[in-house]
Amino acid sequence: MTDSSYDAQAVRSWLQGLQTQIADTLGAFDGTPFATDAWQRAPGEKLRGGGYTRILEGGNFFERAGIGFSDVAGDALPASASAARPQLAGRGFEAMGVSLVLHPHNPHCPTVHMNVRLLIATKAGEEPVFWFGGGMDLTPFYGYEEDAQHFHRTCRDALQPYGADLYPSFKRWCDEYFFLRHRNEPRGIGGIFFDDFSAPGFDQSFAMLRSVGDAFLKAYLPIIEKRRNIPYGQAERDFQAYRRGRYVEFNLVFDRGTLFGLQSGGRTESILMSMPPVVNWRYNWQPEPGTPEARLYSDFLVPREWV
């Protein structure tokens, strides 16, 4: 985080285009256009700035799909952003990014999350400090080996031009990050996750971020195209709702993006659009041995090298 030369407008323009491209593509896939909710922080609020929330609820394929763009600034980095770098505590900041979570109706189609972001810390009389973060991860309810392999292969290929070491490092980071410590289990089958990324300089770091964001549809669309017409019943929906409970637990207890948004006075509706619309908890529930539900735990919710 030593290179202070950056082009925030270039990042902003790309993020806005990425949000539009993904929303248009997924809206066409569903047959339902995304609604757009433009928002702006009022004068005197803790944060300045605004964004666009693209939301689809009760669609033909997606039960809930949210794609948010935000560009906000504040006077002091919240604890969730500065804990790992105490020297930046109290600095002003600008944070911009696109974050999405997609919840299909069909339990055979996985939930997916993707985020790409830029954060700039500022202090009067000192050079600004920037870094990129992001990634994508897949949360299946019924596991398919070829889907997990395709998702990870696409992530690896997006990172390959920027260093052969990035995918193994970001994959391991993702496995460690999306882990429910109180359950001793991962949230899903992972993907890639990175933060504090700026060492190659702005141009190369931004190019890597673009490669990740632009790979999202390649990673996810072939999976849902293949699984969308698999029949399912109430038992599968019940298991999906039960596993979605883990998603809620992670997002509200551990997720740095959620905590950053809430701690910084972010827009609650946009922050919590990642929540699944139907979810349940059961006391000490265990899957029947030999079932597809049991196989999710034994074969997919374990550390694996998918590619």
Curated annotation (Swiss-Prot):
<feature type="binding site">
    <location>
        <position position="113"/>
    </location>
    <ligand>
        <name>a divalent metal cation</name>
    </ligand>
</feature>
<dbReference type="Pfam" id="PF01218">
    <property type="entry name" value="Coprogen_oxidas"/>
</dbReference>
<keyword id="KW-0963">Cytoplasm</keyword>
<feature type="region of interest" description="Important for dimerization">
    <location>
        <begin position="247"/>
        <end position="282"/>
    </location>
</feature>
<dbReference type="GO" id="GO:0042803">
    <property type="term" value="F:protein homodimerization activity"/>
</dbReference>
<feature type="binding site">
    <location>
        <position position="152"/>
    </location>
    <ligand>
        <name>a divalent metal cation</name>
    </ligand>
</feature>
<feature type="binding site">
    <location>
        <begin position="265"/>
        <end position="267"/>
    </location>
    <ligand>
        <name>substrate</name>
    </ligand>
</feature>
<feature type="active site" description="Proton donor">
    <location>
        <position position="113"/>
    </location>
</feature>
<dbReference type="InterPro" id="IPR018375">
    <property type="entry name" value="Coprogen_oxidase_CS"/>
</dbReference>
<feature type="binding site">
    <location>
        <position position="182"/>
    </location>
    <ligand>
        <name>a divalent metal cation</name>
    </ligand>
</feature>
<feature type="binding site">
    <location>
        <begin position="115"/>
        <end position="117"/>
    </location>
    <ligand>
        <name>substrate</name>
    </ligand>
</feature>
<comment type="similarity">
    <text>Belongs to the aerobic coproporphyrinogen-III oxidase family.</text>
</comment>
<feature type="site" description="Important for dimerization">
    <location>
        <position position="182"/>
    </location>
</feature>
<comment type="function">
    <text>Involved in the heme biosynthesis. Catalyzes the aerobic oxidative decarboxylation of propionate groups of rings A and B of coproporphyrinogen-III to yield the vinyl groups in protoporphyrinogen-IX.</text>
</comment>
<dbReference type="InterPro" id="IPR036406">
    <property type="entry name" value="Coprogen_oxidase_aer_sf"/>
</dbReference>
<feature type="binding site">
    <location>
        <position position="99"/>
    </location>
    <ligand>
        <name>substrate</name>
    </ligand>
</feature>
<comment type="subunit">
    <text>Homodimer.</text>
</comment>
<feature type="binding site">
    <location>
        <position position="103"/>
    </location>
    <ligand>
        <name>a divalent metal cation</name>
    </ligand>
</feature>
<dbReference type="GO" id="GO:0046872">
    <property type="term" value="F:metal ion binding"/>
</dbReference>
<protein>
    <recommendedName>
        <fullName>Oxygen-dependent coproporphyrinogen-III oxidase</fullName>
        <ecNumber>1.3.3.3</ecNumber>
    </recommendedName>
</protein>
<dbReference type="GO" id="GO:0006782">
    <property type="term" value="P:protoporphyrinogen IX biosynthetic process"/>
</dbReference>
<dbReference type="InterPro" id="IPR001260">
    <property type="entry name" value="Coprogen_oxidase_aer"/>
</dbReference>
<dbReference type="GO" id="GO:0004109">
    <property type="term" value="F:coproporphyrinogen oxidase activity"/>
</dbReference>
<keyword id="KW-0350">Heme biosynthesis</keyword>
<dbReference type="GO" id="GO:0005737">
    <property type="term" value="C:cytoplasm"/>
</dbReference>
<keyword id="KW-0627">Porphyrin biosynthesis</keyword>
<comment type="pathway">
    <text>Porphyrin-containing compound metabolism; protoporphyrin-IX biosynthesis; protoporphyrinogen-IX from coproporphyrinogen-III (O2 route): step 1/1.</text>
</comment>
<keyword id="KW-0560">Oxidoreductase</keyword>
<keyword id="KW-0479">Metal-binding</keyword>
